[in-house]
Every structure is written in C-alpha cells, then in structure tokens.
Amino acid sequence: MSTDSYTPSQEPGSKRLKTGESVFARRGVSPSTGGVASAYGNESEKKPSWLQTNKSDIDGKYDKYGERRNAHTTTRDSRLDRLKRVRQKSAEREDVGHEGDEGDEDEGILPYIHLQAANPAIIHNEKQENYRTFQSRISNRENRDINSIVRAHYNQRTQQAKQQGSRVNSPIYKMRNFNNAIKYILLGNWAKHNPEELDLFSFLDLCCGKGGDLNKCQFIGIDQYIGIDIADLSVKEAFERYTKQKARFRHSNQNSNRYTFEACFATGDCFTQFVPDILEPNFPGIIERAFPVDIVSAQFSLHYSFESEEKVRTLLTNVTRSLRSGGTFIGTIPSSDFIKAKIVDKHLQRDEKGKAKFGNSLYSVTFEKDPPEDGVFRPAFGNKYNYWLKDAVDNVPEYVVPFETLRSLCEEYDLVLKYKKSFTDIFNQEIPKYFSKLNKNLIDGMKRSDGKYGAEGDEKEAVAFYIGFVFEKV
C-alpha cells in the first residue's frame, strides 16, 4: 500500500451484512414546532420509556445530568428483551455493524447507484459542468457575530442543496466520501457500548447538521440518538431524513435496511447553552431517562467554540456531564500542527486585501490577523481565520484549535486523550480493515483516476488539514 492510496485485494461488498429488523414500532410524525423536530407523534401515542414524561419534580435537573436510572421498567421488559435478542443476533455475524447494500447510503452517494462506469472518476469529471456550486449570500458579515454567520451559512446550505443537482457531480464529491469514510472508521473503532452499565446504546450528536451521520449510527448499531444543532433548517432536514429512512421498506418482507434506532432532534447552541436547557423544554424528563450516553460526537464543529474559553468550557461541560464513565468523545477538527507547518515553512500568500492565506483550488485559510511566525497562537482562544471549501463552506469564520490546549482543558473535565491522528494516517492505517465493511457506493466514490482508492491532487492537502480525536470519560 502506498502512502496516499489503497489498492484492495478484492472489490468491496463481497461480505455485506444486512441490518436487522427494527425492534421499535413505527412512530407517528408531527410537524416540528418551536424550532424542534421530534421523532414522535401525538402525545396519545405511546413513546419509548426514555422519552416519557417523568412526573416527578425535575427541579435541579442539572445536578442529575450525570446520572441515569435503570431503563428497565415492567412495561418495557418485552421490548428490551427483543432488542437484546436482535443485538445478540447481529453480534454473531462475521462483520458486525456492516451496512446493507441498499437504502442506507450517505447523502451524495445515492445518485451513484445509477451510474454504469468502470472508473467513477472519469464520469465524475465529465458531469461537473451540470452542477451548481454552492455560494452563500450573507450580507453585512463585518457586523454579525459568528453564531449568526454560521447559522445563516448552514441554513442557506440546506436550502440550496436541493437545487444544486446531483451531488455526485460536486467538485468535492470524492473528498466528501473520503471524510465520510474517516468518520465511519472513527465511530466503528471507538463507539463502544457497556450493556452492564446502560441498557441502551445511546449517541449524542452535538452540531448534528442535516443528519449526515445517521447512517453511521445505524452502522455501529445504536439504540437511541439525540441530535442538536444551531441551524434550525438543518435540524428540520435531519429530522426529515431520519423519518424517511425510518419509514423506508417498513413492511417486513421488503427490506430491512432502515433505521432501527429511535431519535429526537432539537435546535440549540451547545457552546453557549447547557444540554438540559436545550432538551428539557421540548422533551420533559429526557435528561433523567436518556442520560448519560455512550458516545458524544462533534464532527467538523468544535473549532467554532474556540472563539472564547467560556464557549469551550461550556462545550466540555456538556460533553463530560452527558457521558457515562468509560464513554467516548469523538470528533474531527482542523489540525493546529498542519496550520503551524504552513506558517513556519513560509507557505503563506497574500490575498487582494493583503491578508495572509494558504490553500489550493479546493480550499483556503485566510487569517484575520497575521499569524505568529512560530505558528504558536497565544492566547489560545479567538484566533480567527476564514475557511473556504469549494461547494461547501463559503468563507465562514473559524478558530484555530491549539490541540495541547484542548487536551489540557479536557483533562480538567475528566476526559483523557486516547487517540489523535491526521485523516491521511487514519485512512492509510485503517482502510484495509474497513474496505470490505463499508458500503460499496461509498468506496467507489473514493476511486482515483489511476484506479486506486484515496485522495488525489488538491484533495490530498484538503483532507490532510483535518485530524480525528477520541477522549474517554474517566
């Protein structure tokens, strides 16, 4: 295997597993209100026990945030028994957590099903001309705070995505697939459930966006999902995506590749609000019944919190109080080491306004102020740059995340670093193990022009900008 690509010994999909039937009955769906999308319908319909209203006084709920009662109740034993049987059956399969062939591809993968081509990279390049590249239209950026800009950007992203055309023709289509593969690997390796401590395998997705990681949650076999994001239209899209896949092929004799986990979604800012204050007004009793969780995930988002130390501490409070002991905090962020190398090696250029920047045809980083010559940012917070990624991020403010600062702060919140690697290293070291497990369309979407798999050209540098990390709650 070369250092920047992978050539498989066999084609993907030769040992594909099917996801087991859902153990939950189909829920009714009601329109979202108050900026919140719920996976549950009318109050008259029966809800899973972890979302039933707790009739006891929930004053002081924040003190209970790190506790959780046993989820077993007399009325739910039969459901939990069924759940355990299904999970045990899945565990006996050779490739646990493997996605099925149909119906569960990530957004951006589905259009690829209808392409007949020996080399996907060729078709991808030929059809890009019919695709509308994303451009945000955010006015008066100079006088808006970062929350306002980020919310507006991702809401516009959600709105425009439906008019852009097939995402298989996006100029960063292969890069999206590469990044998705990295997240599958991170979650597949580090998302662990402890059935002796918690009955249900639970997942808290901070900054969930449009629900791009829902398929990954099905892949790792979770039982319950909670998604929070600052962009209300993205939350609505995530909810619709979940309910569509939840309903898909629900008749037992058609197809089992639908979501088998329950989910709820809420709009909120996990950098300035505490999780109970976001969830409790809309789902009374959820903190008592659904927390702590096994995994907290923050994908491509934590860097927004480094605007200030207060925001980072609020985020880490949410993470540590949400996690059970032994639970994992899994995320992806820009690499401060990568940024430092660009500065120290003098790879910076000047834009038309004289601001320092680096990048290529796919991405760019433009600093608000000249960065320090040694690449070490002091103080560690508020070091802003504008990030541009073709067809995805349109010069949105982000902040440098000095990783040692993050690691040190995490230790204050009982979060110990277990893993940190660049996307390039993760791919090179882990893709051989995952090549036959991941969905064939996702794998095909990473096929290079030379027939190998991985990033090529300007994509190499764009993906090397990121790292994956895992912290464990002790």
From Swiss-Prot:
The UniProt entry, under InterPro entries, shows:
mRNA_G-N7_MeTrfase_dom (IPR004971), mRNA_G-N7_MeTrfase_euk (IPR016899), RG7MT1 (IPR039753), SAM-dependent_MTases_sf (IPR029063)
Q: Which PANTHER family match?
A: MRNA CAP GUANINE-N7 METHYLTRANSFERASE, MRNA GUANINE-7- METHYLTRANSFERASE
- What is the name of the protein in this document? mRNA cap guanine-N(7) methyltransferase
Where located?
Nucleus
**Organism, per UniProt?**
Candida albicans (strain SC5314 / ATCC MYA-2876) (Yeast)
Q: Where is this region: Disordered?
A: 1-106
Q: Where does S-adenosyl-L-methionine bind?
A: K183, C207, D229, D269, Q299, Y304
Where is this protein primarily located? Answer: nucleus
Comp. bias (Polar residues) = 1-12
Entry keyword set? Methyltransferase, mRNA capping, mRNA processing, Nucleus, RNA-binding, S-adenosyl-L-methionine, Transferase
Catalytic activity annotation: a 5'-end (5'-triphosphoguanosine)-ribonucleoside in mRNA + S-adenosyl-L-methionine = a 5'-end (N(7)-methyl 5'-triphosphoguanosine)-ribonucleoside in mRNA + S-adenosyl-L-homocysteine
The similarity comment for this entry is:
Belongs to the class I-like SAM-binding methyltransferase superfamily. mRNA cap 0 methyltransferase family.
Q: Does the keyword Repeat apply?
A: no
Q: What does this protein do?
A: Responsible for methylating the 5'-cap structure of mRNAs.
Q: Where is this site: mRNA cap binding?
A: K210, K216, R241, H303, E398, Y466
